[in-house]
Structure formats: structure tokens, C-alpha cells
Amino acid sequence: MVDEIAGPLASAAELAGAAILQDQKLLSIGLGPDCASATVFASLLHQGVLRERPALPVVEIAAHQIESVNVGVGWAGQRIQALGQPGDVGFIFAALLSHADIQRLSQTAEQRQMQLVWFGNRGPGLNINANDEEIETRVALNMTLAICAARLIDIHTFGPMEGSK
């Protein structure tokens, strides 16, 4: 599984780094159980990972309590429509999303000319997932991937930490 996610995770870090260096922003999107992954990802990018550095431009679009996934996807789509700009990159933690939900979010992002990175499910753009796993495993894996992605974006954007080899 590590080999399957290493390449796409590195590509996601490069995509995010390029967007940041071009004064674009990242959107961290998660609903229900995936909200925690989106929150951790955004927080680590705001505060830095193990070092002081400028906060990165990341917008958190996350809701813990949603009436239904359908309502949550509608709300997230509205936020993407309002906040997304051409060249922005959306990191979507999508373990619970259906194919129809993924299509709705991807269409909204496409209208805003954004690129997407999907965690825990398959969608248009970069995919970092374990789709064959149980939902609980995908949600837990998304949390780990959120931390790894934030760390890789930090290194890609600011270089390795002093004293690290």
C-alpha cells in the first residue's frame, strides 16, 4: 500500500507547493468523520509542522455535524463556489462520499478552474486512497495521510528542516 500512495502523495505536495508559490490557496475539505482530517491538515499548514514559518494560505471547509452527506456536499459545494479561484488546489477527504457526491464537488471545482486531490476515494484529479478497505480504515488512513501531506507540502515549499538529514 505504501508504494501505491507514495507517488500520488509526492505529486500532491508538488501541486500544492506550486499553487502556494503562485499566490494561490489550498482548500481543505472534509465532512462528517473526514472533518477531523481536513481540520488537522489545515491546522498543520497554518501553524507549521515542527518549525516556525509563515502560515500557508489554506481555507478549511469542514463540518462535523451534517444532517446528511447530501446536505453536507451541497454546503461544501457552495463554499467552494464562493471561495475557490482559478489555480487553487482542493484537498478533499472523501471516505464517505458516493460517486454522485464526488461528481457534484468535482463539477463545482471545475467551474472554478481548481485542481483536486482526493483522499479515501476516487475522483477526477490526483487520488490517494485505499478504496478497497473498510470505511473505518479509510477514515483512519485519511488522518495519517493528512499529516503526511502537510509535512511534505511544508518540506516542498520551505525546504528540509535545519539539522535534518
Where are these regions (language model features)?
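Glycine-rich phosphate-binding loops that contact phosphosugars or nucleotide phosphates
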Residues: 31-163
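Structured helix-beta-strand junction loops
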Residues: 22-23, 86
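Glycine-centered short loops/turns at secondary-structure junctions
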Residues: 23-24, 113
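A short, well-structured juxtamembrane/interface segment
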Residues: 1-22
